[in-house]
Amino acid sequence: EKGADLTETDLSSAKAVKEDFAGQTLEYRGETYELSLAGSYQTENAALAQPVKKEKRVVFMGNSITEGWVNTHPDFFKSNGYIGRGIGGQTSYQFLVRFREDVINLSPALVVINAATNDIAENTGAYHEDRTFGNIVSMVELAKANHIKVILTTTLPAAAFGWNPAIKDAPQKIASLNARLKAYAQTNKIPFVDYYSSMVSGSNKALNPAYTKDGVHPTSEGYDVMENLIQQAINKTLR
């Protein structure tokens, strides 16, 4: 039912994750990303009224790619009434812990989930595909249990991560997870948006230089590509 409580196991896991990440930060290109699970959108969420009748609210759940999207193309979100809930540096573990606060409690009709870049970059520890995939599946299941539709999206391409050059096999890990997400979405009849295929470039499977300056985060041109793809999927899902 809507607002159903998490199990004791879920709560214990969430508490452990929260304690593990408390106070952690990531330094990259002169910027400091806060990795804690504090309510970064607490004020915005509190100020957001519940949707009116027939309103089809859409929340975008993500990391700095989503956060940067809102900052780079604010009109895309404002004009469509979309709500961005991206936090730079975060992994799927942290998404899962704040999913109730930043998605379920906002009563959207639909959530768009984009995850795993920072998992693969090992922002909060060694990468385990099964665990990252499981976190994403858990978010889908939580959404469905609360009558929220879901659009899953691919992790964007990246040949490497400037803040963690020790990761040498990012393209392989991204491709593997994306294939698994696509299969899961098809099996469970979940809309799936493939940003990856439209944005990948070269034999090293990098994010197309036309769409990025640092190899990971999209520029305005990159977000143009993403908007065209996601808008079609949202319209189809909510019609």
Task: Label the model's feature ranges.
Residues 61-64, 85-88, 114-118, 153-157, ...:
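Active-site-proximal beta-strand/loop segments in catalytic clefts of secreted hydrolases
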